[in-house]
Design a protein with these regions (language model features):
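Non-catalytic beta/alpha edge segments that cap or flank active sites
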Residues: 1-183
Length: 183
C-alpha cells in the first residue's frame, strides 16, 4: 500500500518521494561529451553536436568535448580524463553496436562501480517502438563511477534524440543528485 501522496504500482504516476528528490536535484549538470569514431572530427560530428544542443537547451553545461578513436584503451583513457574534470555526467556516442570496431561497452564496463541496467533496457524498448527488431543491435548502457554518471549511446542521431529526450534529460538532475549523495 503506498504512503499518503504516493502512487502505487506501474501506472506511470510519480511518487511523492521521487518528486521530492527531483525538487532537490541540481537544475544544471556539468556534462562531458565523447564521440567514439575513427571517421569524425569536430566539424563533422553531427551526433556530438546534437548531444551538446540537447543538453544545453535543457539548461545543462557541457564542460568537455572530445572525439576518440574506436579503440578500447583510447576510450577508457578519454573517459577517465573527462571524469577527472568538472563533469557530473559523461555521455559517449558511438561504438555501441555489434560491428568488430564497436568496443565502447567493453571499454566502459571495467570503469563502472555500478551499472544502471534499466537504462539499456528502457532504451532498447523505446528503440523497438521506433525501429523494430533492429533495436537488438544496441548495447547502450549506463552506470556510475565515483559519484558520476556514464551513458554510452549509439552514434545515430535518432537514437541520441530518443535517449536524451525520453530517458536522460527527464532524470539527469535527479540521477546526478543521487549519484553524488552515494559517492
Amino acid at each position: 500500500v503506498p504512503a499518503p501522496g504516493e502512487t502505487g504500482g506501474s501506472g506511470g504516476g510519480e511518487s511523492a518521494s521521487v518528486a521530492r528528490h527531483r525538487a532537490q536535484a541540481p537544475q544544471q549538470v556539468h556534462c562531458a561529451v565523447l564521440t567514439v569514431s575513427d571517421t569524425r572530427n569536430l566539424q563533422s560530428d553531427l551526433g556530438g553536436d546534437l548531444l551538446v544542443q540537447l543538453l544545453e537547451s535543457a539548461g545543462h553545461r557541457v564542460v568537455f568535448r572530445e572525439i576518440v578513436a574506436d579503440d578500447a584503451d583510447a576510450i577508457r583513457a578519454a573517459a577517465l580524463c573527462a571524469l577527472a574534470g568538472d563533469c557530473r555526467a559523461l555521455l559517449l556516442t558511438g561504438g555501441t553496436g555489434i560491428a568488430p570496431r564497436d568496443v565502447t561497452p567493453e571499454a566502459l564496463r571495467p570503469l563502472l562501480e555500478r551499472e544502471l541496467p534499466g537504462f539499456g533496457e528502457l532504451f532498447r524498448m523505446l528503440s523497438y517502438r521506433e525501429i523494430g527488431a533492429a533495436a537488438l543491435l544496441s548495447r547502450a548502457l549506463a552506470g556510475q563511477r565515483g559519484g558520476k554518471l556514464l551513458f554510452a549511446l549509439p552514434g545515430s542521431r535518432g537514437a541520441i534524440r530518443t535517449a536524451l529526450e525520453k530517458l536522460v534529460l527527464p532524470e539527469l538532475g535527479h540521477l546526478a543528485g543521487e549519484s553524488a549523495r552515494r559517492a
